[in-house]
Regions:
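Extended alpha-solenoid helical-repeat scaffolds
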Residues: 2-83, 87-271
């Protein structure tokens, strides 16, 4: 009888999901620290199980606890295990935990390189998109160097969803690994005239952010931006472009004269 009771308690522990954790914390306001400490011990037991569903459930709970300020860096290897799952539902939980708890100096981050590369090259666009979104939160110099070519390849994807994410991700790559900018520049310029407005906006955003540091390097793109300014109806993008021209006029005063009439037309259009 005692053995059956212990077994029942053990099985019930694995039945606790994120909803149960949140409910339990709310019901134990007077003893919150003690309750969470108990939950942490249960989660550690769950992470030692072979069942990936149990591990994913444990990582989901850890992610919530991390949002409350608890350190979960000790579970980095378990998070990587869930990230590598073949099931998208579990993989998404792993990447969410990684995006919240990993950082560029995280130990064992080097173990994720091949796994992320595999996800970036997945047939399922949402798996590749998930990898791009997660990577943007914890990319390191080594990851940027090793995965730059894979991300550049996605800039030419047939799927606008991936092209847009890849363009935005390249900005993070440039910050960590500036050497990637030169080989990626032709593709980035090409995306400024992408047929998809989302991809085009992403490219404008990336170039404008890069130009804030050194506008002179992007003077060659002035004709492309002038064309966008006179044809686009995206107000957000127009504001970005006008600010960019403002930076460029420091190095090429003629730009101010050339865009004056277009600026007047824009003001009249929205007046």
């Amino acid at each position: 009888m005692a053995l059956k009771k212990v077994k029942g308690n053990f099985e019930r522990m694995f039945d606790k999901n994120l909803t149960d954790l949140v409910r339990g914390i709310r019901n134990n306001k007077d003893n919150e620290s003690k309750y969470i400490a108990q939950c942490m011990e249960e989660i550690k037991v769950e992470l030692r199980q072979d069942n990936i569903a149990v591990k994913a459930n444990a990582v989901a709970k850890l992610t919530y606890l991390q949002m409350l300020g608890y350190d979960i860096s000790w579970a980095i290897f378990n998070i990587i295990e869930v990230m590598s799952s073949n099931k998208f539902t579990y993989k998404r939980i792993g990447y969410l935990a990684a995006s919240q708890s990993f950082h560029a100096d995280s130990e064992l981050l080097m173990l994720t390189t091949n796994m992320i590369r595999k996800d970036l090259n997945a047939q399922n666009q949402y798996e590749a998109g998930l990898a791009l979104s997660g990577l943007s939160c914890f990319i390191s110099h080594d990851l940027a160097r090793d995965l730059a070519n894979d991300i550049m390849t996605l800039m030419s994807s047939t799927k606008p969803y991936l092209r847009m994410k890849a363009v935005l991700m390249m900005y993070k790559v440039f910050l960590r690994y500036p050497e990637a900018l030169r080989p990626a520049f032709p593709k980035l310029k090409e995306k400024l005239e992408d047929p998809d407005p989302g991809v085009q906006s992403a490219a404008v955003n990336v170039v404008c952010e890069l130009a804030r540091k050194n506008p002179k390097n992007y003077l060659s793109l002035a004709p492309v931006f002038f064309k966008l300014m006179t044809t686009s109806t995206n107000n957000w993008m127009l504001i970005k472009i006008i600010k960019l021209f403002g930076l460029m006029t420091q190095y090429e005063p003629d730009i101010g004269r050339k865009i004056t009439q277009s600026l007047i037309d824009l003001i009249c259009r929205y007046n």
